[in-house]
Amino acid sequence: MAFTQPPLPFPKDALEPYGMKAETFDYHYGKHHAAYVTNLNKLVEGTPMESLSLEDVIKQSFGDSSKVGVFNNAAQVWNHTFFWNCLKAGGGGAPTGELAAKIDAAFGSLDKFKEEFSNAAATQFGSGWAWLVDDGGTLKVTKTPNAENPLVHGQKPLLTLDVWEHAYYLDFQNARPAFIKNFLDNLVNWDFVAQNLAA
């Protein structure tokens, strides 16, 4: 069974008032994400991995030098689908309930979390991702290079930000810190993060 690209969870122009152009999604979703899906299907066709879940393909191919292409494409399919759900028109603000309490417990305050997350995203050299994860019941900020994600480290992803240049260049050019601030202030879908925590 072929892997498929889920639809965006919002119209491609929905985030324009919040700093992300429809053109960004034409390229980022329409070309980059779509290409990862196409490449993954070509790489696993006729192999036992074809029938696995995307998560299992990621876990089984990680660290296997003969399956680098499979891992990179599978992880990027998963990462992007997860990232789109982390975005919401008019998002940002503050989380509530258990999520807010866990963030306060782990980081001291929402502002301290934002500072740590922003630092992770800004200092990821080259391409990669910044994450908020549940690591055995404790919330942590982490960052991963290229396609890597927390699933391969036994962590539960709660929130991510794509810091590959193609994620922000049309909107923010080389100003990655401005992209990060805009994400935290205007786009974070805290409802999705809370669902991930509760799952």
UniProtKB/Swiss-Prot annotation:
It comes from Leptolyngbya boryana (Plectonema boryanum). Binds 1 Fe cation per subunit. Belongs to the iron/manganese superoxide dismutase family. Its cofactor is Fe cation. Keywords: Cytoplasm, Iron, Metal-binding, Oxidoreductase. Its main location: cytoplasm. It catalyses: 2 superoxide + 2 H(+) = H2O2 + O2. The gene is sodB. PANTHER family: SUPEROXIDE DISMUTASE, SUPEROXIDE DISMUTASE [FE] 2, CHLOROPLASTIC. Pfam families: Sod_Fe_C (PF02777), Sod_Fe_N (PF00081). This is Superoxide dismutase [Fe]. Its EC number is 1.15.1.1. InterPro entries: Mn/Fe_SOD, Mn/Fe_SOD_BS, Mn/Fe_SOD_C, Mn/Fe_SOD_N, Mn/Fe_SOD_N_sf, SOD_C_sf. It is found in: Cytoplasm. Induction: Expressed constitutively, although partially repressed under conditions of iron stress. PROSITE patterns: SOD_MN. Fe cation binds at residues 28, 80, 162, 166. Homodimer.
